[in-house]
Amino acid sequence: MTVTDTAASRLSRLKAHADLLAQSLRGIEKEGLRVDAQGKLAVTPHPSGLGSALTNEHVTTDYSEALLELITGTHGRVEPLLAELENTHRFVYSVLDGEYIWNQSMPATLPPEADIPIAWYGRSNTGMLKHVYRRGLAERYGKAMQCIAGVHYNFSLPDALWEILDPGAADPQTRRSRGYIGLIRNFTRYSWLLMYLFGAAPALSRSFMGDRPHPLQALDADTLYLPHATSLRMSDLGYQNNKAQAQLKLCYNDLDTFLARLYGAVTQPWPEYQAIGTHRDGQWIQLNTNVLQIENEYYSSIRPKRATGRCERPVTALAERGVQYVEVRCLDIDPQQPVGIAADTARFVDAFLLFCAVSDSPYFPQNGYCQRSADNFSVVVKEGRKPGLMLDRDGVAISLPDWGRELLDHIAPYAALYDQALGGDAYARALQAQHAKLGHADDTPSARLLAELRDQGVPFHEYSLQLSRRHADALRAQPLPADVAAGYAEAARQSHAEQARLEQSDDVDFDTYVARYQAALKAPGSR
């Protein structure tokens, strides 16, 4: 975009081509722990009826063998997106026997660390790489933190829209990547608002913290919380408390610098990890001793993404073909929704991301990192509902409700454009529903959860188990149509066959495969 171009002029151009917004795409990856009837982490293998966790495109596992990940395709509207997510939940429940999907971001009752099962993907080199990477996560961060779950929201805008927003770019790939990186800068500035409006993890089971020191208070004998927290999941209880991750400050001023720093993190040894080593008792325990084993280890609330081929590294794919979409990673599971996310939340996120894409997005002056934005985010996840809370907007203090209302006013035209493109007024209503939360913090999901714990007089674990059972009953009461069920079953069958094919086609040992995978990483800018 030109130096004299403004958000107002870009919005004006967008209004003339609002129909292009119908080509926006969104997809969801929703995590959820399998638990037994008592709400304890399931220690059973990934059910065979769900297919291969390595190759089934609908259902896989994340860190633990018990941490399900339900994946949708991409959709042009929210309604079919959530319909697919609901169908996948129904399919999973048609297979689960005496188990439930834990419908909270903060984990169920966990066994001792040694007994938390790491996800297993079979004996192919591809599967073993995923498994060993997870062994490394256990060494670096502990297993309990890896059992935290969330909703990842993938979002893209059509190339024709980027051309309207940035007509002066040299080529479509540069334009698209520049646009998404600008979106990410604004997301970094304003994502505290998402945590206030949708954060739903202010409490957790005491057992989760174990013997670790923490700032949490006791709500009851079994529940820890912070009185004004919105999302303990996104607080410094986890990755951000890790020294290697904490010192890693990537640059969001341009894609090339972002990739150069990410490349540095996956190639630079870290002393503590060197002390651990890559092998113990003849077994691989981490892929390497670098700051990050692979790119996906980097902890962030949003990522630039590009689909990769087999054995292709994300840094290489992004460097060669540019950003394809963004992955929003800060959404907590909505415990009131059977599928973990409400339609209004998805619509608001769409409008919010479009606002981030079109609004002015100055470079971050601190070498491409914005400490002020990180501080705002951190304070909101831990005390976002605190009366009189002030945030830092460009060095000037402003109250959270005042800034939030201003942002909603700025987002409103983008919600209206989605309604214009898709018909109806669902986006405007989704945005309007958020105003009440800024005027009344008790209306936020985090406040409602704490109020229900107090009103019902039950600990977090019991409350969450009751809710998860209720959602399971509702989903099981509406079985899939026969043809849809058959489609899921066939995908599961084919995934087992594909895993077997991969295991039979390996022509090198695992050590060689890991070396090749590391060698596939190209420095950005190299050919």
Curated annotation (Swiss-Prot):
**SUPFAM superfamilies in the record, alphabetically?**
Glutamine synthetase/guanido kinase (SSF55931)
Give the record's keywords alphabetically: ATP-binding, Glutathione biosynthesis, Ligase, Nucleotide-binding
Q: Does the entry annotate any disulfide bonds, and if so which pairs?
A: none
What are its E.C. numbers?
Answer: 6.3.2.2
* Any single biological process term in GO: glutathione biosynthetic process
Q: Which GO terms describe its molecular function?
A: ATP binding; glutamate-cysteine ligase activity; metal ion binding
InterPro entries recorded? Gln_synth/guanido_kin_cat_dom (IPR014746), Glu_cys_ligase (IPR007370), Glut_cys_ligase (IPR006334)
Q: What class of enzyme is it?
A: ligase
Identify the domain of life. Answer: Bacteria
Q: Into which family does the record put it?
A: Belongs to the glutamate--cysteine ligase type 1 family. Type 1 subfamily.
Q: What is the protein name given in its UniProt record? A: Glutamate--cysteine ligase
Q: Which organism is it from?
A: Bordetella petrii (strain ATCC BAA-461 / DSM 12804 / CCUG 43448)
